[in-house]
Amino acid sequence: MNKLLAILLCVSMVLSGCTAVNDEIQDQVFDNFGCTDTNALNFDENATIDDESCIYDGPIEILEIADIEGCDNTNSIHCMLPFPSDAFLINDQNTTTGKRIHYSSTTIPNSGTVDLVEIPILNQMDGASPNTQIMTAFEKEPDISELAGQFSISKSLENGHSTQLINRITGELIPHWVELDIRSEEDQPTILHIRTIKALEHNTPYVVTISGLTDESGELVPTPEGFAALRDQILTSSMDIENRRAEFQNLFSFIEVNTDISIQQLQTAWSFHTSSTESIIGPIISMRNDALERIGEGGLGCNVETNEEIFDEQGNRSHWLISGTYTAPQYTESFYPPTLIRRVSVTDRTPVFVEDREIPFWLVIPGTAIEEPADLTIWGHGFLGTGDTSGLYGWANENNAAMLGTSFYGWASDDVTSLEYAVLDMNYFQHQAERLEQSMINQVVMIKSFMGICSDLPDLYLNGTSLVDVTEPVYTGYSNGALRGPSIIGLSPDLNRGVLWAGGSSFSHIIERCTQYDRFHFIFASEWGYENQLDRAVAISIMQSLWDSVESDTFLHLREEGYLDEVEPYELMTLFSIGDLQISNISSARMMRTANIPILDSSTIIPYGIEVVDENHSGSVGVFFDGGYILAPDGNEYGEEPHPAHNAIGALSSARDMAFKYLQFEDIVDTCNGDCSFSPDNLSWN
C-alpha cells in the first residue's frame, strides 16, 4: 500500500507540475516537456520532449525535502530566497503581464512584535519590482574577489563569469556587480547580492544563473538541495518543487540554448518577471487625473496665514516669507499617519476620493522680485523634513527665484513615529507608502493652484505688480527631494525640467548605505524587530514594490519617452557630491543610467556606462563634484557622521550657478571650468 501511495503521490506531483508552466514563455520559444513513454504511469500525450520524469511500476526513491507552505523550497536557507522569483508569481489573465504576485500568509517574515505579516495589496501587483534587490544565499560563503565589483562592472559581461543576469526575451546579458552582505551575522549564511546598475525593464522576464562559485579554499560552494533535485532529475517529497519541475525544465532549456553553461555546472538558477508600468503607476495616475479634474485649471483655493517681510542686518529688504494652505483633493482616509488610501475594492487598487483638505505651503519671495517677477521654483525637502523654504532666502535672492514648498508626507517630520513602528510591523509600510502617494498628488495640485487661483493672492503683489512669474514653474530638490523629483515632474502636467541635488535611485539599494538609516536600524534589528539580517534584507526588498509608484527609478525609466498620454518626457540636471554618506554615489550613478543622462566632461568621475558630453550639449546632464572628503565604505553599510559631503554642493556657488542657469535658461554652462573639484572652505548656502 505504501508503495502504491508513493507512486500515486509522484504521479500527482509530476502531472500537477505540467499545469505550472510559464505559458507566456513556453508559447514563445519552448516545447512541452514531460514523459513521452507510453509505457510509463505518467505518460503525457501533450509532451513533445522527454524530461526524464517518467514513472514506472517499481520501487521509487524519493528525496525528503521540507515542503514549507508559501515558500520557495528550492533554497532552504530562507523562505523567500532566491529573490525575486517566479516562485511567488501565479498566472492571471486579467493583468498586463499575465502574472500576479502571490504571497501567502506565511511568506513574509514575521517580526519579534508581529507573528503574521500580510500585505494583501502586494498580491495585486503583476510582477516583481524592476527596482528591487536581487539576492540568494549558500550554506558556505563564496569567494567573490574575482567577480565583478562596483568598480569592475564590465567583468559581469565576460565569458565564464560566475553570475549572469539575462533578459529572457532578448538573451541580452545585463551588466551588474556582486556583493556579499557585510551586515550578515557570523552564525548565519551570507546573502549574495547581484546588484543591477539601473532599473530593469518593465514587464520583462529575467533569468539568473550562478555557476563556478568557490569558497576561500577553492572548493565549489554546495548547491542548495532543492535546486539540485530539479537539476539532477531527482524526485522529492516537496509538492512545491515537483509542481515547478516543468517550469525549471523550460528554464534549463533556455540556459542551454542561450549560454555556454552546462546544466550540471549550475549551482543555482531562477527566473522572475518584472511588473508592468500599468501595475506600478496605474492607480496613482488615476488619482492624479481625478484630482486634476476636481480642481480644474485654476485650483480650488489658497489661504495665507502669515506674511513676514524680512530685512537683512543693514536694514534692507531681504525677502518675504509667506505661509498658508491650499486646497487639495484627498484620497487617504485621514490626514494623519498611519492611514491608507481608500480604494474601489480589495481587488481593485483604483483610489477613491475622500474629501478636500487644507495642505500647508511655504513661499519665499526674494527682495529682487521688485525689479522683475521671480521665477516660480518648486522645492523638494530632505529626509523627514518639511516644505518650509525659509532657509532658502539666499538661493532665492541670488537667482531671483520664488521658492515654494510643501511637505512630502510619508517621509516628513511627522512620520518618524509611524516609521519606527513600521520596522516592527511591516504592514505599516503600506500606510507610509500610500501617504507618500497622496503627497505627490498634493504637489501636483499645489503647482496647478499657484499657477491659477493662488497667483491672485494680494500677498504675491507689491503696489499692484506681481512678484512671482508663474508661467513656467521648474523643480529643484535636495536629498530626499531629489529622490522625489522624477515622480513629481513626471506626474505634474506643468513641469518639464528640474535640477536634482545629492540624489539617487531605488530606495532598497540606498537605505542600508545611508546614515539616515541609523535612527531606525537599532529598532529594526532588535528582538522586537528582525534580529536576522536575512529577514531584514528580504523585508527591505519586498517593500520596494510598495514604494515603486513614486520611486525615482520608476519615473526615471520613463524620462525619455514618457508613458502613453499620461507622463510626458522631461529633462534633468543631476548634481552629486563625491563621498556622500546619505545617498551613495553608487545610487547616484544608478539614477543617471536609469534615466540615460549623460555626464558633463568636467565631472570628477565618469561612472561605468555613461556617455560624456561637453557644455554644448542640450538636454539632460549630470555632474559629480569633489570636495576631497573621506569616501563612503565599499560595503552595504553607512559611514560615520558628521560628514559634510552631502550638503556641501548646495553651499557651492559654482554648483548653484550651474543649476539655476539650467532651470531658468535651459543652458548647460560649465561653471567648473573643466574640473568640478572644489575646496571645502568658505562654503555657504546663503
Predicted segments — roles?
Residues 24-59:
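Extracellular calcium-associated, cysteine-rich motifs in secreted modular proteins
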Residues 1-27:
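Secretory targeting signatures
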Residues 334-358, 370-462:
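Cap/lid segment of the alpha/beta-hydrolase catalytic domain
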Residues 303-373:
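N-terminal cap/lid segment of alpha/beta-hydrolase-fold proteins
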Residues 184-211, 215-216, 349, 354-393:
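A conserved hydrophobic secondary-structure block that centers on an alpha-helix together
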Residues 435-438, 496-497, 501-686:
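C-terminal subdomain of alpha/beta-hydrolase-fold enzymes, centered on the catalytic histidine
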Residues 455-512:
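Primarily recognizes the serine-hydrolase "nucleophile elbow" in alpha/beta-hydrolase
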Residues 59-329, 335-336:
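Acidic, low-complexity Ser/Thr/Gly/Pro-rich repeat segments typical of extracellular/periplasmic
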